[in-house]
Structures are given as C-alpha cells and as structure tokens.
UniProtKB/Swiss-Prot annotation:
The keyword Cytoplasm does not apply. The lineage of its organism: Eukaryota, Viridiplantae, Streptophyta, Embryophyta, Tracheophyta. GO terms for biological process: defense response; killing of cells of another organism. This is Cycloviolacin-O15. Belongs to the cyclotide family. Moebius subfamily. Probably participates in a plant defense mechanism. Has hemolytic activity. The keyword Disulfide bond applies.
Length: 29
C-alpha cells in the first residue's frame, strides 16, 4: 500500500511521495 505521511521535516523537506511539510510533520498533499 501507500506509505503514510508522518515523517518529521525539520529541514522543510518530505521524502515520502505525495507528502508536503506541515512543520514539523509531513502531511498528505
């Protein structure tokens, strides 16, 4: 399945496809 967003993005960057940084956690686009 799809990888859920939820990584931290203290650098302002999300590496999970389809996710964007909603500091400090990546959220779905």
């Amino acid at each position: 399945g799809l990888v859920p967003c939820g990584e931290t993005c203290f650098t302002g960057k999300c590496y999970t496809p389809g996710c964007s940084c909603s500091y400090p956690i990546c959220k779905k686009n």
